[in-house]
């Protein structure tokens, strides 16, 4: 998933955290999903 700057302006860190937690939970690997998604965005 690629988000542009305008999307980020309208999303709070709490919302992003919820997305990461939900995605990681659905994948059955919470911590790995969270770390992977954050690392992808920060690259």
UniProtKB/Swiss-Prot annotation:
Cellular component GO terms held in the UniProt record: mitochondrion
EC number: 3.1.-.-
InterPro entries: Homing_endonucl (IPR027434), LAGLIDADG_dom (IPR004860)
Location of this chain's protein in the cell: Mitochondrion
Superkingdom in the source lineage: Eukaryota
Molecular function per GO: endonuclease activity
SUPFAM superfamilies recorded: Homing endonucleases
Keyword Secreted belongs to the record: no
Biological processes, Gene Ontology terms: intron homing
Reported function: Mitochondrial DNA endonuclease involved in intron homing.
Stated family: Belongs to the LAGLIDADG endonuclease family.
Other information: Encoded within intron 2 (LRI2) of mitochondrial large subunit ribosomal RNA.
Protein name stated in the entry: Probable intron-encoded DNA endonuclease 2
Protein's organism: Mycosarcoma maydis
